Amino acid sequence: MSLGLVGRKVGMTRIFTDDGEAIPVTVVEVGDNRVTQIKTDETDGYTAVQVTFGARRASRVTKPLAGHLAKAGVEAGEIIREFRIDAAKAAELQAGGSLSVDLFEVGQKIDVQGVTIGKGYAGTIKRYHFASGRATHGNSRSHNVPGSIGMAQDPGRVFPGKRMTGHLGDVTRTVQNLEIAKIDAERKLLLVKGAIPGSKNGKVIVTPAVKAKAKA
């Protein structure tokens, strides 16, 4: 994983290009990502940078975590994440420092990871886009049922992975190869072309795209 930023999904809006084209964008606030620890091969077995984002009341911070953050000289945040980096990049960073939007540039391809909106218990039509039954013509009380879930006495069981009703959403998902349409360095905002996972105020992780195609 490359060095990235932890941010907050503000919401969606649209911006206009110089040609007058409207582009739907998601606004991501990537305020101060405070460096809490630099991990190295010698001390931890791998190289990474650990960062915290947001704010948390002191009464909500455990004593071990408070000591860990005090060692780095940073305030407690809502979330702590780490990014795997190489030794050369780790040498440029230090605990107590911060990361900002200058890690990215306009037009760059990125991956955005977040927790999708929870939909609760959902049927197969909403969950897997099954077709509903006929409204009339002999159909009664079977309009939204999934239909048969198995065969006969042989095999006499429902195969694992059968698509059925159940919990929908509230899972971690990554959308790849999104494009940064605009950067507001003063307000520490990334305007990402398209939609990203999660609800408003949800925490997201922004990293350089791992499958970005080289420009011809």
Swiss-Prot record:
Methylated by PrmB. Residues 134-153 are annotated as: Disordered. It holds the Pfam family Ribosomal_L3. One of the primary rRNA binding proteins, it binds directly near the 3'-end of the 23S rRNA, where it nucleates assembly of the 50S subunit. SUPFAM superfamilies: Translation proteins. It comes from Cupriavidus necator (strain ATCC 17699 / DSM 428 / KCTC 22496 / NCIMB 10442 / H16 / Stanier 337). NCBIfam families: L3_bact. GO terms for molecular function: rRNA binding; structural constituent of ribosome. Keywords: Methylation, Ribonucleoprotein, Ribosomal protein, RNA-binding, rRNA-binding. The keyword rRNA-binding applies. One of its GO terms (cellular component) is cytosolic large ribosomal subunit. Part of the 50S ribosomal subunit. Forms a cluster with proteins L14 and L19. One of its GO terms (biological process) is translation. The keyword Ribosomal protein applies. Belongs to the universal ribosomal protein uL3 family. Coiled coil: none annotated. This is Large ribosomal subunit protein uL3. The modification N5-methylglutamine is found at Q153. Transmembrane segments: none annotated.
